[in-house]
UniProtKB/Swiss-Prot annotation:
Residues 44-81 are annotated as: Disordered. Residues 48-80 form the Collagen-like domain. The lineage of its organism: Eukaryota, Metazoa, Chordata, Craniata, Vertebrata. GO terms for cellular component: blood microparticle; collagen trimer; collagen-containing extracellular matrix; external side of plasma membrane; extracellular region; extracellular space; serine-type endopeptidase complex. This is Ficolin-3. It comes from Homo sapiens (Human). Glycans are attached at residue 189. Its main location: secreted. The gene is FCN3. A carbohydrate binds at residues 258-259.
Length: 299
């Protein structure tokens, strides 16, 4: 009987039994024990090697936002020298051109009041140094706007814009400025009109247009009629008509009763889609025959 118990135990011993490894949890494997009564050798097993890590679980839901932090300390006052520097900076695009800025693009000019103003300078046309204050080209910007909008200026630097009546007033307070109007029809034909001087009075005078003599241009003169006229928008009627010209023709301009030019009028995407009143220059294509592209610029 004792032999029957011993043989299986020896068989396990010959097979080597479970492998024993030293780990931190089990620094050594327990040795074999022998039971005196039965002479049976017991081979205790050791803990196996740790398995490989399982896959990372999915992230849990986002927790609620924390409470707002405390308000930071008050910042230091700005440097008043910046105002002085702007007062000493360039006042027009021609001055920038003389300083070596030969590429057309957006620059900063200093207004007489000391404020920096971003403007587009055309450094290529007719000797360069032109400040573009109005541009129409694709109808992406609505020009049927309020008095306050025309006062401040609006639009997109990459497409269409109006620089702003107050900015034009500040710019033309000093020096002599000439005006160039450029027009392009839907067939790509380009014309222009040139005026000796241009100035815009202040808001107290409703941004009245003070225009010099028409000097030259293939487009003819369609702006002299508007010289001496205040600016009119749909919510500020200063024209000489019994009605509001801005409302009638869907624009904003130095209307009389009503116009020979209307370069802030409604945009037409094609000749076939022309409106009764649009971007017109009467001495050019006539009223009701709008232009596809327009630029107004000063130097």
């Amino acid at each position: 009987m004792d032999l029957l118990w011993i043989l299986p135990s020896l068989w396990l011993l010959l097979l080597g039994g479970p492998a024993c490894l030293k780990t931190q949890e089990h620094p050594s494997c327990p040795g074999p024990r022998e039971l005196e009564a039965s002479k049976v050798v017991l081979l205790p097993s050791c803990p196996g090697a740790p398995g490989s890590p399982g896959e990372k679980g999915a992230p849990g839901p986002q927790g609620p936002p924390g409470p707002p932090g405390k308000m930071g300390p008050k910042g230091e006052p700005g440097d008043p020298v910046n105002l002085l520097r702007c007062q000493e900076g360039p006042r027009n695009c021609r001055e920038l051109l003389s300083q070596g800025a030969t590429l057309s693009g957006w620059y900063h000019l200093c207004l007489p009041e000391g404020r920096a103003l971003p403007v587009f300078c055309d450094m290529d046309t007719e000797g360069g140094g032109w400040l573009v204050f109005q541009r129409r080209q694709d109808g992406s910007v609505d020009f049927f706007r309020s008095w306050s909008s025309y006062r401040a200026g609006f639009g997109n630097q990459e497409s269409e814009f109006w620089l702003g009546n107050e900015n034009l007033h500040q710019l033309t307070l000093q020096g002599n400025w000439e005006l160039r109007v450029e027009l392009e029809d839907f067939n790509g034909n380009r014309t222009f009109a040139h005026y000796a001087t241009f100035r815009l009075l202040g808001e107290v005078d409703h941004y009245q247009l003070a225009l010099g003599k028409f000097s030259e241009g293939t487009a003819g003169d369609s702006l002299s009629l508007h010289s001496g006229r205040p600016f009119t928008t749909y919510d500020a009627d200063h024209d000489s008509s019994n009605s509001n010209c801005a409302v009638i023709v869907h624009g904003a301009w130095w209307y009389a009763s009503c116009y020979r030019s209307n370069l802030n009028g409604r945009y037409a995407v094609s000749e076939a889609a022309a409106h009764k009143y649009g971007i017109d220059w009467a001495s050019g294509r006539g009223v009701g025959h709008p232009y596809r592209r327009v630029r107004m610029m000063l130097r």
